[in-house]
């Protein structure tokens, strides 16, 4: 069969994760996936983030040897010098995305993304308070797609390009090809 890659944005990432259960992947493996802005109920994303390598932040986790799954944000963090396995999965997420980092646990527990090094787009003035931070991030949910591209739940084309190149590893593709493709999208007006 032809190569099969999965894609999901937001709730699509949640559904896409569920469609690629482990048994199915073993029986008839996909080649990879790009999941962007995974919402907080995403079980696979939550498990990987919870079990990330020590020292890697929850907003940009490293998982095991990075051969099967990698995370990226505003800056390309896919570390293409590391060896990939036969299945390549990339999560695109921004630390300022309330869809990804909201949690009912915010009611009474300080989240990992506010402990230690913060994401580049999380205000240093954001302080966790029981109940209050839960409400603040909860109120951000309906506005998650209103920030400019590259912030919140507004994923930029450049980040998609980096992710798809990492996942598909197109033969003969060069850094110049990537730069040209990114420029093509940068020259287009934003959607909406």
Ranges and model annotations:
Residues 6-13:
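Gly/Ala-rich beta-loop-alpha elbow adjacent to hydrolase catalytic centers
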Residues 13-19:
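Hydrolases whose catalytic domains are alpha/beta-hydrolase-1, hotdog thioesterase
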Residues 1-2, 21-192:
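C-terminal His-loop and adjacent cap/lid subdomain of alpha/beta-hydrolase
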């Amino acid at each position: 069969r032809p190569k099969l890659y999965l894609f999901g944005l937001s709730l699509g990432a949640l559904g896409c994760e569920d469609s690629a259960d482990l048994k199915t992947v073993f029986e008839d493996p996909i080649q990879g996936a790009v999941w962007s802005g995974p919402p907080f109920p995403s079980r696979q994303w939550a498990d990987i983030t919870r079990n990330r390598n020590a020292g890697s932040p929850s907003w940009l986790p490293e998982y095991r040897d990075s051969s099967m799954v990698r995370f990226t944000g505003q800056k390309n963090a896919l570390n293409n010098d590391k060896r990939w396995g036969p299945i390549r999965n990339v999560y695109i997420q921004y630390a300022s995305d309330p869809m990804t980092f909201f949690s009912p646990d915010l009611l009474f527990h300080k989240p990992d993304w506010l402990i230690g090094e913060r994401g580049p787009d999380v205000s240093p003035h954001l302080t966790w308070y029981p109940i209050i931070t839960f409400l603040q991030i909860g109120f951000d949910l309906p506005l998650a797609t209103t920030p400019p591209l590259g912030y919140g739940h507004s994923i930029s084309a450049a980040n998609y390009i980096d992710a798809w190149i990492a996942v598909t590893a197109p033969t003969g593709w060069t850094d110049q090809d990537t730069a040209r493709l990114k420029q093509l999208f940068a020259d287009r007006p934003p959607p909406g």
